[in-house]
Design a protein with these regions (language model features):
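Extended, composition-driven regions rather than compact fold-specific motifs
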Residues: 1-194
């Protein structure tokens, strides 16, 4: 069946990237996203939710620097075994890994930082982009990218960033001034869980 696009209420952005090396560090994303959202709202007035389906390209790199985190979460596989994705072929093992991997990713998004000289910024470049444009880390998707690259980078996990229109400016200001990460209550609880 064909979906009546006039009834659409959610727009999902997939694979937003800042590809030009010379533009790294230049925040054109906020302007671009706001313009696209305005255009979409004009063309599809019922749209009221704007989110992304985004990769976490440096999750496995971070775990490689902190391998003890796997044992702390009860994950018995080594980082390279997780990155191979072979475990996903065993449905029972995949079910066992679902919650610990989601918790690992929530911890990563909430607390993995790198210093830029002034403030500690998220280790993940995609997270820096979306948080720097006022998004909120909303949810995690297990087995969302089962490509070899998806397993190699993030064990098959992907993340949704939500652009809540009435929160964008507040989130952006808090992130820019203090490095505060806007995150859904569900993910924040998951990140704190021990």
């Amino acid at each position: 069946p064909v979906f009546d696009h006039r009834k659409a209420h959610t727009a999902i952005f997939y694979s937003i990237s800042n590809t030009q090396r010379g533009l790294r560090g230049v925040s054109f994303g906020s302007f671009l996203l706001k313009r696209v959202i305005d255009d979409l709202k004009r063309d599809f007035p019922k749209l009221d939710q704007f989110a992304t389906l985004s990769p976490m390209p440096t999750l496995a790199t971070w775990v490689g620097k902190n391998p003890q985190l796997l044992a702390e979460l009860g994950i018995e596989l080594a980082p390279d075994e997780l990155a191979s994705g072979t475990w996903a072929n065993d449905a029972k093992q995949a079910r066992r890994l679902r919650d610990p991997l989601r918790q690992l990713a929530a911890n990563y998004l909430a607390s993995a930082k790198q210093s830029n000289g002034h403030t500690a910024m998220p280790f993940d470049p995609v997270s820096r982009f979306h948080l720097g444009n006022g998004a909120r880390v909303e949810s995690l998707n297990f087995m969302a990218d089962t490509s070899a690259k998806g397993f190699r980078q993030s064990y098959g996990l992907m993340v949704n960033y939500l652009y809540e229109l009435d929160e964008i400016e507040t989130n952006l200001e808090a992130f820019a001034s203090t490095g505060s990460i806007a995150m859904s209550a569900t993910l924040r609880r998951l990140a704190r869980k021990k």
